[in-house]
Amino acid sequence: MPGRTRPSCRLAITFTPRPDSATPRAGRAAPATGRRSNRSRSTLSATASPMPRRPHRIRSLGLLDRRDNYLDMLRTGGGIESPLIEAGALSDAMGLEPGCGRLWIKADHGLPVAGSIKARGGIHEVLEFAETLAVREGLLSPGQDCRVLAEPAAREVFGRHQVAVGSTGNLGLSIGVAASALGFRAAVHMSADAKEWKKERLRRRGVEVVEHAGDYERAVAAGRSQAQADPFSHFVDDERSLSLLLGYSAAALHLRGQLAEQGIVVDAKHPLFVYLPCGVGGAPAGITFGLRQLLGPHVHCFFAEPVQSPCFLVQMAAPAGTHPSVYDLGLTNRTEADGLAVPRASLLAAGLMQPLLSGIFTVRDDTLFEHLVRVLDATGERIEPSAAAGFSGPALLTGSDGGRLWLRAQGLDVQLPQATHLVWTTGGLFVPEAEHQRFEARGRSLLEAAA
């Protein structure tokens, strides 16, 4: 087993104050603050609870396109859900000291259909759009079996419409696969960071892949502009979509049940710390929102970002009414964590997280590869680099000066022995074997050099 994670000299961390907890003591890291802006087209109150209308169980996709054999969906009755994995064997390697709680993994890297966390929000929005369109066209009545969406009449209607998205990769896979399965014309605008294998996977599905030389932000802007000019095009806007965000939030419904099955209590004496990789912010914000709605203030969520792409940290620390980019701080936005290579955060997500988010930390690319190998060795789970971002969180929270100060300020230090640390992994199922081997080789080389 590789040695445990070294001190946080390779990481940076900041913690946000919680409105329902003690005021931070002087001398702490500067609090990150985010504020809503009218530049977001959708708004959502952190005190409201507009959870998705239906439980987020997708029971029809496996019937829609028989080119795909969704065995995992057959085993789960058509549901798209990931397991909750006990990871005690990983605790020491990740620097989680004895007596500081138990470590678990929420394994969204293995979600069926899209192979990443993006299956949650992406497929939710595609199905919501399809259902809305079918009702409008008289093909579906309220309460009717949604399997009519797989019938030829529905596919004929859907074929006249396009579903488009801008993506660095995983959201594009989610939208492209779901939309094409239903019969929509699908277009994915992909940034320069996108991996070639993800583009090829989409092309094999008949999805139009539009390549852009610029970054994620430019790909999204180009896709949005093109869709606005076409009345038959629906654009899934990763920066502004409330439907997408609420699709992610539904994960909390299933996690609550999984925690109960494992006998994991979440209350004042048993805090739950959740560590989520963050790109533009929609997925981790949606999950955080859902968890806080269902489990209350004893859930403490932290976002993990690449050192060169900390767009959410930049936004939360920015003055009111501004929307800065990581480039404004002299950062490069270059990272092997392609799904997290975002220069500017979603204002919708940032506004929602201002009163809910507990903290943000940054991770070096080398650390992602080291943790990827540690996860593989301890659990056998194969993840991509961006999915490894959250694993630095438990050691930073319980072992760094900033983390310990925050725990004491919240009165949580005395509750650590009963705490649960949940690292949310985000992608990896469909990564080609050659890519996995490259990831592993780089990680092992780094660990050997550090030994």
Swiss-Prot record:
An example Gene Ontology molecular-function term: hydro-lyase activity
E.C. numbers: 4.3.1.18
Family annotation (InterPro entries): D_Ser_am_lyase, Ser/Thr_Dehydratase, TrpB-like_PALP, TrpB-like_PALP_sf
Catalytic activities: D-serine = pyruvate + NH4(+)
Entry-linked Gene3D superfamilies: 3.40.50.1100
Top enzyme class: lyase
Record keywords, A-Z: Lyase, Pyridoxal phosphate
Stored Pfam families: PALP
Cofactor section: pyridoxal 5'-phosphate
Protein name, UniProt field: Probable D-serine dehydratase
Lineage: Bacteria, Pseudomonadati, Pseudomonadota, Betaproteobacteria, Burkholderiales
